């Protein structure tokens, strides 16, 4: 497997590197800069998938690019540096055996100072405080409405069952139909008293003054919201 011809890249990529100090790209005593946190070949930022690896010339590149540059020279695996063309031997062709660039890894290990954005905190606290009781009241009203709808649905099913019994019983037990009708009339009266004549319920058949006030108030609230 012959080495691929890699075009010589200009040395201006890292102006800190000198022939006497090729590790100047590490950022000096102040640590690596933002430009040193990405590979000079693929321009991808270093990460756990693309760890920075040092060649024999102390130039660092990501492990993915080094795997692509890996070739055989003199029956041995080696990688030519894209910057200075110096060949680095890789035992067994394993790029993971190369040394990591510790300064860059330490920089990546330190979490950045990020400010979490909370959109709910941008709103007016007074508005949120005033909106919480209203939301609680709306949820309670929705729960009551749901329960009332379920009760009405049950009453409709019971009435349907009563009608079926009235239609079937005269053909089966002609003498018992009188008592059954009396029982059904009593049950219907109880249901009517429960669902229509209770003064404390907002969803009853007889509207209370409070219910009328709420119904008159809803369109104005909708208009103010829109």
Swiss-Prot record:
Signal peptide: none
Molecular function GO labels: ubiquitin protein ligase activity; ubiquitin-protein transferase activity; zinc ion binding
One Pfam entry name: zf-RING_5
Enzyme Commission number: 2.3.2.27
Membrane topology: Multi-pass membrane protein
Post-translational modification: Polyubiquitinated. 'Lys-29' autoubiquitination leads to proteasomal degradation.
Record-annotated membrane-spanning stretches: 157-177, 179-199
Zinc finger boundaries on the chain: RING-type: 39-85
Pathway(s) of this molecule: Protein modification; protein ubiquitination
SMART domains: RING (SM00184)
Gene3D superfamilies: Zinc/RING finger domain, C3HC4 (zinc finger)
Catalytic activity: S-ubiquitinyl-[E2 ubiquitin-conjugating enzyme]-L-cysteine + [acceptor protein]-L-lysine = [E2 ubiquitin-conjugating enzyme]-L-cysteine + N(6)-ubiquitinyl-[acceptor protein]-L-lysine
Keywords: Endoplasmic reticulum, Membrane, Metal-binding, Transferase, Transmembrane, Transmembrane helix, Ubl conjugation, Zinc, Zinc-finger
Localization in the cell: Endoplasmic reticulum membrane
Biological process according to GO: intrinsic apoptotic signaling pathway in response to endoplasmic reticulum stress; proteasome-mediated ubiquitin-dependent protein catabolic process; protein autoubiquitination; protein K29-linked ubiquitination; protein K63-linked ubiquitination; protein localization to mitochondrion
Main location: endoplasmic reticulum
Quaternary structure (record): Interacts with BNIP1.
Physiological role: E3 ubiquitin protein ligase that is part of an apoptotic signaling pathway activated by endoplasmic reticulum stress. Stimulates the expression of proteins specific of the unfolded protein response (UPR), ubiquitinates BNIP1 and regulates its localization to the mitochondrion and induces calcium release from the endoplasmic reticulum that ultimately leads to cell apoptosis. Plays a role in the maintenance of intestinal homeostasis and clearance of enteric pathogens.
Domain notes: The RING-type domain is required for ubiquitination.
Name this polypeptide is given: E3 ubiquitin-protein ligase RNF186
Lineage: Eukaryota, Metazoa, Chordata, Craniata, Vertebrata
